[in-house]
């Protein structure tokens, strides 16, 4: 930790203070108890439920490495493997179901800047806090995006947000027109990845097609499939039963908080003396006014991590922003 307190300017009537702090912590797990398994879980869980991410102590990594078993499954070339739902005409990433490291919760550094300006009896102070780095899991973004409640889920919803426009030509297996035939949509998108071996889909022509090893883009260009609806894409990518880790809810946490602004005034001694006091001052303060920078999508509160346990990394709901305002009268006798 480094702290630097400075007075860049001072004269008879003016004084300017400028202070900085910088904190960085590097750590590494050297050894675990012989009875421990591959790692010791701290917070969260893998393998069941709707969390599917866990902070852990693992030899060779930092305290608080993040592990998940719902990373997208990939082939040897790094391509995401897609599964298919015929009923929804939707493709979605398969889960790896292997515990894999997806990052760690430790910030790269913490810092603060505070400055104060005094002119005669009038004073002003402002303080900023900041954090850069370390991953958090924002479950409000995950499930909010799955059901279309977040601003980030607007992407592809219409032409104005990048959605593809097409008129459906889907036929039933007997060659008759399906219920969507002739309907024009504006919310199309093409998911990334290739279909798993053995994947069969009902195509636009109502017939079954083997799309093993084919990308969705190729299936679209070959006239087998139509674009996928944005609502289905977000739902499959984020819901509890099929969702995978993605940038929509696993984020690098960075913020600069406007922590405090205070304005104060110290009355002349002759005024304080009228009430029998030696000192009399008044100040107005506002704390937690907002964020000059916030890396989290959908304006999520970056300080919404629940609890004070050292292994906690989850923001589990949309916590409101709170600020407080105070007026203080200082009297000295």
Name these PLM-found stretches:
Residues 1-333:
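Outer/extracellular conduits and scaffolds centered on Gram-negative outer-membrane beta-barrels
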């Amino acid at each position: 930790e480094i702290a630097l307190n400075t007075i860049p300017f001072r004269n008879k009537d003016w004084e300017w203070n400028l202070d900085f702090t910088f904190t960085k912590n590097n750590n590494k797990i050297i050894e675990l108890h012989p009875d421990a398994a591959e790692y010791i879980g701290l917070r969260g869980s893998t393998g069941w439920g709707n969390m599917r991410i866990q902070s852990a102590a693992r030899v060779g990594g930092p305290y608080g490495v993040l592990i998940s078993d719902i990373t997208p499954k990939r082939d040897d070339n790094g391509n995401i493997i897609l599964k298919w739902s015929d009923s929804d005409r939707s493709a979605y990433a398969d889960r790896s179901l292997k515990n894999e490291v997806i990052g760690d919760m430790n910030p790269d550094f913490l810092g603060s800047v505070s400055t104060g300006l005094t002119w005669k009896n009038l004073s002003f102070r402002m303080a900023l806090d900041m954090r850069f780095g370390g991953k958090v899991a924002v479950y409000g973004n995950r499930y909010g995006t799955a059901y279309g409640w977040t601003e980030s889920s607007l992407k592809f919803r219409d032409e104005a947000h990048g959605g593809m426009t097409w008129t459906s030509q889907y036929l039933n297996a007997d060659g008759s027109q399906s219920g969507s035939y002739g309907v024009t949509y504006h919310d199309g998108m093409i998911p990334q990845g290739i279909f798993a071996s053995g994947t069969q889909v009902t195509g636009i022509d109502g017939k079954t097609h083997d799309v093993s090893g084919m990308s969705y883009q190729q299936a679209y260009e070959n006239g087998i499939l139509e674009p996928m609806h944005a609502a289905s894409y977000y739902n499959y990518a984020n819901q509890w039963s099929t969702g995978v880790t993605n940038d929509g809810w696993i984020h690098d946490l960075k913020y600069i908080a406007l922590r405090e602004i205070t304005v104060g005034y110290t009355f002349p001694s002759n005024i304080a003396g009228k009430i029998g006091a030696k000192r009399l001052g008044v100040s107005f303060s506002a704390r937690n006014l907002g964020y000059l920078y916030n890396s989290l999508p959908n304006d999520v509160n970056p300080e919404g991590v629940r609890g004070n346990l050292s292994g906690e990394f989850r923001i589990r709901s949309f916590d409101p922003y709170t600020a407080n305002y105070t007026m203080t009268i200082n009297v000295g006798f």
